[in-house]
């Protein structure tokens, strides 16, 4: 009987802890979201970044990973514009970039599905584009991420990834990481994706996307 009472008491403690944690998540989320809106209005100026925003965001990221997808969208902005862009210390910048990569990977882990199905390919593509932008020396990681995006989504791949992927394929060849034949192979594959999307968007009269696709192909 005493054992049963002890187990029951322990269960209530756990339930209480879960409720407290959920409340903490809500509080931190509301707090950092308010600060990030203000920061957005300041055009992500690092000097206008409130330290409490980072503290509250970090608490959500570490302790409430499946609470809101916005945690990861906002995390990319915080790391890229608040830290990576302004840091002169290369060793420290690498750590910030590692965190940026982790944010993308965690988003894919906890929020793999979007409105139209799997969004993992799109998340990996965005990771690859950011790696090219902020850490061009990490081109192999960028290649892996962008290739995953193209492989997973095929004709439905974000057309914004096409240029970045082909560019990093060329970089891989120049550095002896891929055979020269990869350039022609991937050009053919990407051209098929572009042609498919031009056809689809011509039928739906989406001129803006058509112009971008034609630019990518040129």
Task: For each feature predicted by the language model, list its residue ranges.
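Bacterial Sec-dependent N-terminal signal peptides
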Residues: 1-26, 76
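Preference for long, solvent-exposed alpha-helical segments and helix-linker "stalks"
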Residues: 23-218
């Amino acid at each position: 009987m005493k054992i049963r009472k002890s187990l029951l008491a322990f269960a209530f403690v756990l339930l209480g802890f879960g409720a407290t944690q959920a409340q903490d998540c809500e509080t931190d989320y509301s707090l950092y979201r308010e600060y990030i809106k203000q920061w957005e209005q300041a055009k992500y100026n690092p000097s206008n970044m409130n330290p409490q925003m980072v503290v509250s965001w970090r608490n959500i990221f570490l302790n409430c990973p499946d609470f809101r997808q916005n945690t990861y969208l906002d995390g990319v902005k915080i790391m890229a514009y608040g830290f990576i862009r302004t840091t002169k210390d290369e060793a420290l910048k690498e750590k910030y970039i590692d965190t940026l990569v982790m944010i993308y990977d965690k988003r894919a882990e906890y929020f793999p599905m979007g409105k139209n199905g799997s969004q993992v390919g799109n998340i990996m593509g965005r990771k690859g584009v950011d790696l090219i932008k902020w850490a061009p020396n990490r081109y192999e990681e960028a290649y892996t991420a962008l290739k995953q995006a193209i492989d997973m989504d095929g004709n439905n791949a974000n057309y914004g990834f096409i240029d970045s992927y082909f560019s990093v394929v060329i970089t891989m060849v120049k550095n002896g990481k891929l055979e020269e034949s990869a350039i022609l192979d991937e050009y053919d594959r990407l051209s098929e994706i572009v042609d498919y999307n031009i056809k689809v968007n011509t039928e739906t009269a989406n001129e803006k996307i058509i112009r971008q696709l034609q630019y990518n192909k040129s």
